[in-house]
Amino acid sequence: MAGTVRTACLLVAMLLGLGCLGQAQPPPPPDATCHQVRSFFQRLQPGLKWVPETPVPGSDLQVCLPKGPTCCSRKMEEKYQLTARLNMEQLLQSASMELKFLIIQNAAVFQEAFEIVVRHAKNYTNAMFKNNYPSLTPQAFEFVGEFFTDVSLYILGSDINVDDMVNELFDSLFPVIYTQMMNPGLPESVLDINECLRGARRDLKVFGSFPKLIMTQVSKSLQVTRIFLQALNLGIEVINTTDHLKFSKDCGRMLTRMWYCSYCQGLMMVKPCGGYCNVVMQGCMAGVVEIDKYWREYILSLEELVNGMYRIYDMENVLLGLFSTIHDSIQYVQKNGGKLTTTIGKLCAHSQQRQYRSAYYPEDLFIDKKILKVAHVEHEETLSSRRRELIQKLKSFINFYSALPGYICSHSPVAENDTLCWNGQELVERYSQKAARNGMKNQFNLHELKMKGPEPVVSQIIDKLKHINQLLRTMSVPKGKVLDKSLDEEGLESGDCGDDEDECIGSSGDGMVKVKNQLRFLAELAYDLDVDDAPGNKQHGNQKDNEITTSHSVGNMPSPLKILISVAIYVACFFFLVH
């Protein structure tokens, strides 16, 4: 009897001694009745017809290959694969949520802001005609409206030639100026000379170099603005494309093996190894990671474009000061009115039925000396500062695609590599294989992940990124070029204050009008660019913690109290054996 007691105490002491060493303990054996598996699977698929009552050989399984009896059937395996792919898509969308929200909101803000600029520029131009040339007002309003409508369409991508827009504006204005200002007494019988006057406008350069100046300014500023909006819209397309990728069957099998095959053995609380997750994600997302190089170039090229968007490359500065340049062009016509009237009288004589008396008015009559006076305005938030703010936020996502595999693993339940974890086949103490890097240029030790080229949809989005990057580089202004004398002379001849932030131009009338150049009216936009409160942004940040709290740890170290109790029992048994 004493021998039996001594033997029992020795066994207890040995087991407790192993516990005192702090080694991780294996989980309890699987449920022999598949009860836990049935309960869990019912959450994914209502009904239990596919779940065996007791473990089965599982000879028909293709992914969760059993080493013994299993609680999974082929139908369950298929459901797990579908669920794994859906989980992957949701994780991708969660990863891109903040970035996607940032670009979508800014694209909407800037598009509407540019429309506001166009609307204000049209109003300023109409006000200039009303205050200085009331006789031209009805027709001028129509021509100005058509011009700025074309400007809006061009910004949105319409196939309109900027030079044609400007030429049409001046071609339409000159006949009105000639018949209403230079020859207001022109008989009705000779008013059919409009086509001749339109042609004479270009041949005689009646507006001097002002049309060419406006072409240069408007063309440069609108091209940059148009590319800027196109780039933002492409950014949205890139994110949408990667958000809804359809992963290969090989990837689906690997995800299933990592996340669900442990359930077939009744190991419901076991987590995949962190290193194993990294390898699987690197393989599944190898094609997506190929986007990284072009995505980085996209953000840097967009930054370079934004840095050059001022003065004649800033549509706010150009369009909001356009009324002053048009006013100067009309003054030029007035100054040369006598000579022009004589020349045009001869040029368009075939269109005139009889001689008429020239009623040219002196140049000072229509000149408002206040037109170029400057009213300085205090600094407020501008579109320029908004653009710079956007770039700074985008740069925080410059490694977005290369960091995606790590993000997915960090936001899904995985076990650290120094704990008991699931390696796709069984429980292991430590997963030693390192995750491969650099996309598809490396080989993996997982035969399921066949190295192929990027999916066609990924290849297409890469081609689009290459194209927009080339456009951005082409349109970007080399550093310092905007300050060159030639460009200053070309872009700031007519009424520019020349300040990078607050630009202003005086107007005629009872005093100076503050021009809201560098948009001081952003408050009109009902948008908020702060993405900190983006829907779901606060949720996915704590996703990992929530998942951890809902799962039990595997192989935890014994608590200090348990160790003390074990030591006490061990010592008691030792003294019993000795005595």
UniProtKB/Swiss-Prot annotation:
Sites bearing Pyrrolidone carboxylic acid, chain numbering: Q25
Removed propeptide positions: 554-579
Lipid-substituted positions (GPI-anchor amidated serine): S553
Bridged cysteine pairs (disulfide): C34-C71, C64-C261, C72-C264, C196-C348, C251-C284, C273-C421, C277-C409
Keywords: Cell membrane, Disulfide bond, Glycoprotein, GPI-anchor, Heparan sulfate, Lipoprotein, Membrane, Phosphoprotein, Protease inhibitor, Proteoglycan, Pyrrolidone carboxylic acid, Signal
TM ranges: none
GO annotation, biological process: animal organ morphogenesis; anterior/posterior axis specification; body morphogenesis; bone mineralization; branching involved in ureteric bud morphogenesis; canonical Wnt signaling pathway; cell migration involved in gastrulation; cell proliferation involved in kidney development
Tissue specificity comment: In the developing limb, absent from the apical epidermal ridge at 11 dpc but highly expressed in the underlying mesenchyme. Expression in the mesenchyme at this stage is asymmetric with highest levels in the regions of the distal mesenchyme within the progress zone and within the proximal anterior and posterior limb bud. At later developmental stages including 12.5 and 13.5 dpc, expression is restricted to the interdigital webs and the regions of chondrocytic differentiation of the developing bones.
Modification comment: O-glycosylated; contains heparan sulfate and/or chondroitin sulfate. Cleaved intracellularly by a furin-like convertase to generate 2 subunits, alpha and beta, which remain associated through disulfide bonds and are associated with the cell surface via the GPI-anchor. This processing is essential for its role in inhibition of hedgehog signaling. A second proteolytic event may result in cleavage of the protein on the cell surface, separating it from the GPI-anchor and leading to its shedding from the cell surface.
Glycosylation site positions: N123, N240, N417, S494, S508
Chief place where the protein resides: membrane
Modified residues (Phosphoserine): S351
Domain of life of the organism encoding this protein: Eukaryota
InterPro entries in the record: Glypican (IPR001863), Glypican_CS (IPR019803)
One Pfam match: Glypican
Signal sequence, start to end: 1-24
Subcellular localization, as worded in the UniProt entry: Cell membrane
Subunit structure: Heterodimer; disulfide-linked. Cleavage by a furin-like convertase results in production of alpha and beta chains which form a disulfide-linked heterodimer. Interacts with DPP4. Interacts with FGF2. Interacts with WNT5A. Also interacts with WNT3A and WNT7B. Interacts with hedgehog protein SHH; the heparan sulfate chains are not required for the interaction. Also interacts with hedgehog protein IHH. Interacts with CD81. Interacts with Wnt receptors FZD4, FZD7 and FZD8; the heparan sulfate chains are required for the interaction.
Record-stated family: Belongs to the glypican family.
Function statement: Cell surface proteoglycan. Negatively regulates the hedgehog signaling pathway when attached via the GPI-anchor to the cell surface by competing with the hedgehog receptor PTC1 for binding to hedgehog proteins. Binding to the hedgehog protein SHH triggers internalization of the complex by endocytosis and its subsequent lysosomal degradation. Positively regulates the canonical Wnt signaling pathway by binding to the Wnt receptor Frizzled and stimulating the binding of the Frizzled receptor to Wnt ligands. Positively regulates the non-canonical Wnt signaling pathway.
Protein known as: Glypican-3
Protein source organism: Mus musculus (Mouse)
